[in-house]
Amino acid sequence: MMKKFIAPLLALLVSGCQIDPYTHAPTLTSTDWYDVGMEDAISGSAIKDDDAFSDSQADRGLYLKGYAEGQKKTCQTDFTYARGLSGKSFPASCNNVENASQLHEVWQKGADENASTIRLN
């Protein structure tokens, strides 16, 4: 007797929790060029020139400000050391900063430690 009620009740509960896919559809907004620049620098990408943007409305000034802010976060000795230690390449976004040679040395130290750890395992 109880089994007759459980299956329909379960079906009713599951169907009542269904989400309408159009309710949470993303809205198209304009590109935040500051964030794009910051993400490029943090990911280690080289700075993009105007030809790299497919959007004719790209705000180069905001992109460059965001890129510079991303470089401040990325181009630090601890961060580059950790990248080397984890086997990642030296971030191209740090190639043109004032202390690039120092950062590259620190990154190389981490990369060397990573390589020796791999050989030991």
From Swiss-Prot:
InterPro entries the record matches: DUF2799 (IPR021242)
One Pfam family of this chain: DUF2799
Protein name stated in the entry: Uncharacterized protein YfiL
Annotated gene: yfiL
